[in-house]
A protein has these predicted regions:
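Short, well-ordered beta-strand elements within core beta-sheets of diverse protein domains
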Residues: 123-129
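Bacterial N-terminal signal peptides
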Residues: 7-16
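Glycine-rich, aromatic-lined ligand/substrate-binding cores of catalytic
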Residues: 227-382
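Positively charged n-region of N-terminal signal peptides that target proteins for export
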Residues: 1-4
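Histidine-centered catalytic/metal-binding microenvironments
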Residues: 445-554
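Substrate-recognition/cap regions that form aromatic- and gly/pro-loop-enriched pockets
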Residues: 327-464
């Protein structure tokens, strides 16, 4: 059957102007502290990183909600507002419900240009109105059916205190009457629960294949799913063998290498089974050798494990971005866009890792069901590239956010000196110049900061749990804001320190206390700096090349 497909991965690999996101999911039985965890990297070359805050509110009967497309901010229409909405900080609400996503595009004829609700609006509406993952899945599907779905194919991570799910959704093929009205409004969708004790992920490719038809404990799906795919000419086999992912998001090289490989990296690092058996799949050589939707980890994962996985560049694998010629002389694990290139008529693509330079914001969110809701939900939030940015903890009950992370402090075309996004970007740009030197030091600062904050969060948990709910909310809001403010000033000092230490390709010598050594005659002329130069493999490559002949000393 001939089908057309729009693959977000193609754009990521070839042109680099599409959105590409990564979600990791860790169920409570797979985490070292018993929390459900969801990560999300909002990757886009035009996305500005800020911490979204939607305060709890009450609305009068008949109130309407204007819908603007997530990202472009294009007005789509309006829908009735709920009588009451919950507090939302980032992508977690006051009931510890967490939602993230990644876009996979899908069949080009399954996009409703007249839909009112895009995926971003559906996510945040669900966070404002729902308390559990199952409620959120049901609401998203119901609203998309009623008002039309304005986005392409999506995978949506949804976790609460007990469960973690993946929802995959795409618009039905539009059919118009003489008035231009879509008679086929609505969505096709499936959802799978990740079994407790397992980990999962998705990264711009649909991953749910077959589903158990009579297992509501573990699967949910559109009532008219099988009726629709038959009527649309997409599938005519038995329901038990129907694959959602293969039908709506057929795999190609770009999806395998640029998207599924990121999932493989997570499974390879922490999975109990040998993921080497799927190398031909993620290399793009054997699309039939699909990875499972979820795997059991070899050990339970800590918050730090999960955060650091978001900083992965395939280190230690055959896809290691620090090792190929594109890494240059400083083991740089980044490739500037466009990622596709051509040599002698052959097309090539660079690797696409979880950590990437164009991240707007990212997070690791925890739902800790053994704690009261104001205390249990924490979103560890960061802006820009995960590999060079620190996380700051924000409790789900917070009624305000730090000015340094708030909406309105700068944007992608306007610099703000008090914006954490711009400050972290300043540091990152410097890291990219000498990644194995500057980047290594920044990573050590990130690690020390996050380990300290985990201890401080544990202490704050204990303090807040002993308080009344009202006092706990006030205390945890203050804790969250002050922690973010402190981090901003810590990063400002780091930015200044790095410039002084690493200026002009040099590295200044330091005393045991961290101060810079001087020449011994005064306190303002430095000692002779160190010249760290380039990686040996880079110099070897130059020496053995045609250019090396020109540089050879005579």
């Amino acid at each position: 059957m001939k089908r057309t497909i729009i693959s977000i991965a193609i754009a990521i690999l070839a042109w680099g102007n599409a959105w590409g996101c990564t979600n990791l999911i860790v169920t409570r039985g797979a985490s070292s502290d018993g929390s459900n965890m969801v990560t999300y990297a909002a990757d886009s070359h035009t996305r500005y990183g800020f911490l979204n805050h939607l305060p709890a509110a009450k609305y009068p009967a008949g109130a309407l909600r204007a819908i603007y497309e997530y990202g472009p901010e294009r007005y789509l229409g309006q829908i009735p507002e709920a009588a009451r909405t919950f507090n939302v900080v980032g992508n977690i609400n006051e009931h510890q419900l967490i939602i993230g996503e990644s876009t996979w595009g899908g069949l080009t004829d399954h996009i409703d240009p007249k839909g009112i609700l895009d995926y971003g609006s559906l996510m945040y509406i669900a966070l404002q109105r729902c308390t559990t993952a199952r409620e959120a899945i049901t609401l998203i599907a119901k609203l998309a059916d009623e008002y039309g779905y304005a986005s392409s194919g999506e995978s949506i991570s949804i976790a609460d205190k007990q469960e973690a799910w993946i929802l995959e959704i795409i618009a039905k093929r539009p059919e118009y009457n003489e008035k231009g009205e879509n008679l086929n409004k609505g969505v096709v969708w499936v959802a799978a629960r990740i079994p407790d004790g397992y980990i999962s992920a998705h990264a711009n490719a649909a991953r749910i294949t077959t589903i158990a038809l009579n297992d509501p404990e573990n699967y949910m799906y559109a009532e008219d799913l099988f009726e629709y795919v038959r009527r649309a000419g997409l599938y005519d086999g038995v329901p038990e063998e129907f694959s959602f992912a293969d039908t709506f998001c057929p795999l190609d090289f770009s999806l395998l290498r640029g998207c599924e490989a990121r999932v493989w990296a997570f499974f390879n690092k922490f999975g109990a089974e040998d993921m080497g058996r799927y190398l031909d799949f993620v290399r793009g050589d054997n699309p039939a050798n699909r990875m499972p939707l979820y795997v059991k980890p070899a050990r339970k994962l800590s918050l730090k494990d999960v955060a650091d996985m978001m900083r992965d560049h395939y280190e230690g694998t055959e896809f290691d971005m620090t090792q190929d010629p594109g890494a240059g002389g400083h083991s740089l694990p980044y490739r500037w866009r466009p990622m596709g290139f051509e040599v002698d008529g052959e097309k090539y693509s660079q690797e696409r890792a979880i950590a990437t330079q164009q991240t707007g914001f990212w997070f690791v969110a925890q739902s800790r069901g053994w704690l009261p809701d104001p205390v249990g939900g924490v979103i560890w939030f960061g802006v820009d590239d995960a590999a060079t940015s620190p996380l700051t903890p924000v409790y789900c009950c917070a009624t305000e956010v730090s000015d340094h992370y708030a909406f309105g402090q700068g944007n992608m075309v306007q610099y703000s000196p008090i914006s954490m996004f711009w400050l972290v970007n300043r540091v990152a740009q410097f890291c990219y110049l000498r990644y194995n030197q500057v980047g290594t030091e920044v990573r050590s600062v990130v690690d020390a900061h996050e380990m300290e904050m985990m201890e401080r969060v544990a202490a704050a948990d204990a303090m807040a749990t002993a308080m009344s709910p009202r006092k706990a909310v006030k205390y945890l809001t203050r804790f969250s804001v002050e922690a973010a403010d402190e981090l901003f000033y810590k990063w400002k000092s780091l930015d200044e320190y790095l410039l002084v230490k690493y200026i002009d390709g040099n590295t200044k010598q330091q005393n045991p206390d961290g101060s810079f050594k001087t020449n011994g005659y005064n306190d303002f002329v430095p000692a002779k700096p160190m010249f760290p130069g380039y990686d040996k493999q880079f110099l070897d490559a130059i020496g053995r090349s045609e250019w090396g002949k020109r540089l050879k000393e005579r």
